[in-house]
């Protein structure tokens, strides 16, 4: 039985910097928080437990990256150069590039290679305090390759000190062998791929890319109904490039989240509020493909829709492996506040996964997953660009990462 009192710390238990404790303590037994609060109120039964002094550092819940595509083969730097030369993302996709080029690389890679490549993308997130991550499939687009991706995602969760939730995104793009036969491909997704992968326990949720270069409302709804037959929650890539009404459809199916949302209108926002659907904003993609249409932040605020922030880490539109950078981008590009972005990577991000009862906040009875920060103010998490701020990551009560400090000595 391992018992520890973490003390001499400043605590932000709910991911809200407006509600903090200046001198706090956390009592952890066998990886679970049994008590937390003001250090002066530490119950006598924990007073003799071994102590871990955090020297006045800030502690937040472990961060949650709730929308990623970390598992894939290759990279798309050449397409990045094309876009710099003036070719649009949609034009590249129609030429057989974009998602489909990553499909080719992912299909060609074996499981061991995919694991190595994906681990290199996961590790920087862990070093920034991320203890929970969602990973989507969607670069296989056939049963064997989608299975391979989801198996690798599960292995990442087994090999690294991070909780991984998997999302089946078979309806991400039309594979080359189904050119001109989108409905037939959706048949394959709904009747072959999803049943097999769900039966194998590889799927925690189901996503669909509902867009003019993706799948229609009718096709998206077929995927949702198939997911519901397996009692799997749904989510949607929606309103990124146009207002197609996907968010309203997602809300009708009580989606956990609708993601991107640059072209979301008020009717869609109202539908999200009614359904309890979280808005996941992805500033990395907005920045990387040079979008100019901002997501409707004021409408989301007015309707009190929870807003999460994520990396959208992927090879084509957001090759990002820094959730802290996304916090900065959300403040500078989307005009979000520091409390909004911190909740966006903790409590609201956990809610976007349907896991707010397990992650995104610190309270008695939950796993002791938290990040320790070398900052004077929590605003620094969104302020600094490229500076390593996470001093320690604790998962289930155990230190799983400690930043090595460079020598400060003069020569």
From Swiss-Prot:
SUPFAM superfamilies: Composite domain of metallo-dependent hydrolases (SSF51338), Metallo-dependent hydrolases (SSF51556). Its cofactor is Zn(2+); Fe(3+). Fe(3+) binds at residues 67, 69, 237, 312. Binds 1 zinc or iron ion per subunit. One of its GO terms (molecular function) is iron ion binding. N-formimidoyl-L-glutamate binds at residues 139, 314, 316. Keywords: Cytoplasm, Histidine metabolism, Hydrolase, Iron, Metal-binding, Zinc. Gene3D superfamilies: Metal-dependent hydrolases, Urease, subunit C, domain 1. Pathway: Amino-acid degradation; L-histidine degradation into L-glutamate; N-formimidoyl-L-glutamate from L-histidine: step 3/3. InterPro entries: Amidohydro-rel, HutI, Metal-dep_hydrolase_composite, Metal_Hydrolase. CDD domains: Imidazolone-5PH. Zn(2+) binds at residues 67, 69, 237, 312. It is an enzyme of class 3 (hydrolase). Its EC number is 3.5.2.7. One of its GO terms (biological process) is L-histidine catabolic process to glutamate and formate. 4-imidazolone-5-propanoate binds at residues 76, 139, 172, 240, 317. GO terms for cellular component: cytoplasm. It catalyses: 4-imidazolone-5-propanoate + H2O = N-formimidoyl-L-glutamate. It comes from the Bacteria. Belongs to the metallo-dependent hydrolases superfamily. HutI family. Catalyzes the hydrolytic cleavage of the carbon-nitrogen bond in imidazolone-5-propanoate to yield N-formimidoyl-L-glutamate. It is the third step in the universal histidine degradation pathway. This is Imidazolonepropionase. It comes from Paraburkholderia xenovorans (strain LB400).
């Amino acid at each position: 039985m391992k018992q520890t009192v973490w003390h001499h710390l400043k605590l932000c238990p709910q991911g809200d910097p407006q509600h903090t404790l200046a001198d706090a303590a956390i009592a952890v037994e066998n990886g679970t928080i049994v008590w937390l609060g003001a250090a002066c109120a530490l119950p006598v039964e924990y007073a003799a437990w071994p102590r871990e002094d955090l020297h006045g550092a800030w502690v937040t819940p472990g961060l949650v990256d709730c929308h990623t595509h970390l598992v894939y083969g290759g990279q798309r730097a050449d397409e990045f150069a094309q876009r710099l030369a003036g070719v649009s993302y949609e034009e590249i996709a129609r030429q057989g590039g974009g998602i489909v080029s990553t499909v080719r690389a992912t299909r060609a890679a074996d499981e061991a290679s995919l694991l190595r490549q994906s681990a290199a993308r996961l590790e920087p997130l862990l070093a920034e305090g991320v203890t929970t991550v969602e990973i989507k499939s969607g670069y296989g687009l056939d049963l064997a390759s989608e299975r391979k991706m989801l198996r690798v995602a599960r292995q990442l969760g087994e090999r690294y000190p991070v909780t991984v939730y998997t999302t089946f995104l078979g309806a991400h793009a039309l594979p080359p062998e189904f050119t001109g036969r989108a409905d037939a491909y959706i048949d394959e997704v709904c009747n072959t791929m999803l049943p097999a992968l769900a039966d194998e326990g590889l799927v925690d949720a189901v996503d669909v890319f509902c867009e003019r270069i993706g799948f229609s409302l009718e096709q998206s709804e077929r995927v949702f109904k198939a997911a519901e037959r397996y009692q799997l929650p749904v989510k949607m890539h929606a309103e990124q490039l146009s207002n197609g009404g996907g968010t309203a459809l997602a809300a009708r199916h009580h989606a956990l989240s609708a993601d991107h949302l640059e072209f979301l209108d008020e009717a869609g926002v109202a539908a999200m509020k009614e359904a309890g659907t979280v808005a996941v904003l992805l500033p990395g993609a907005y920045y990387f493909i040079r979008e100019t249409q901002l997501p409707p932040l004021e409408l989301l605020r007015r309707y009190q829709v929870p807003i999460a922030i994520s990396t959208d880490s992927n090879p084509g539109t957001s090759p990002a492996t820094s959730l802290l950078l996304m916090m900065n981008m959300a403040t500078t590009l989307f005009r979000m506040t520091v409390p909004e972005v911190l909740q966006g990577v903790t409590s609201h991000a956990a809610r976007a996964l349907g896991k707010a009862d397990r992650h995104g906040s610190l309270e008695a009875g939950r796993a002791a997953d938290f990040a320790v920060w070398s900052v004077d103010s929590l605003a620094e998490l969104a302020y600094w660009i490229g500076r390593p701020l996470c001093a320690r990551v604790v998962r289930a009560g155990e230190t799983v990462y400690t930043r090595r400090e460079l020598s400060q000595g003069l020569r």
